């Protein structure tokens, strides 16, 4: 018994070492190509402004250095996550039944699909809309000029916050699946509470998006679509579970 436990702990240790060295390698590569990675995150703003006479600034001696480290660190985490997931899968999957493996494969595919589409929508739609709204406050008049000179640290941190918020939002169908499995949610609750939940979504859209009607409507529509997708999935999942019980 002790031998088996020690084997498991040794395997966990080795897998965490693999993950650590993979993260370290990703961090080194990100550090080498940090300027290209910075351009990737700044690109939505560059497309809107063409950066004519504009520039990103840093107001403290070490601010640019800390921003590059922050950027490389979190980019390395995102790049290492699929490998971490693989190591997690390889450790736990031998102890599961066949039906559990099929379910985990479906959930894994579902998770990474939502993750991929959330990245695409955030980068190409949501971020440009947010920056476009804030850039409308630039003014050139006879009395004064008001122009954007964004701090690089504020820009990068705000961009990562937007990514984090919408990553969580796009995983709502997955959260719904686990809640249904644990009997924390029911289909009747999701359907009967729809109007109250829509009202909460409206407040959430007003909080997350800029105070622009089109942006708020777009975000509200996106959240409602995700909610209706959760309701549809819960109905499908419940009917599938009932069919399995009958066999």
Curated annotation (Swiss-Prot):
Gene Ontology terms, MF aspect: proton motive force dependent protein transmembrane transporter activity
GO annotation (BP), single: protein transport by the Tat complex
Pfam family, one: TatC
InterPro entries reported for this sequence: Sec-indep_translocase_CS, TatC
Parts of the chain that traverse the membrane: 19-39, 73-93, 106-126, 155-175, 196-216, 217-237
Annotated Gene Ontology cellular component terms: mitochondrial membrane; TAT protein transport complex
Subcellular location: Mitochondrion membrane
Record bears the keyword Zinc-finger: no
Membership in a protein family: Belongs to the TatC family.
Protein name: Uncharacterized tatC-like protein ymf16
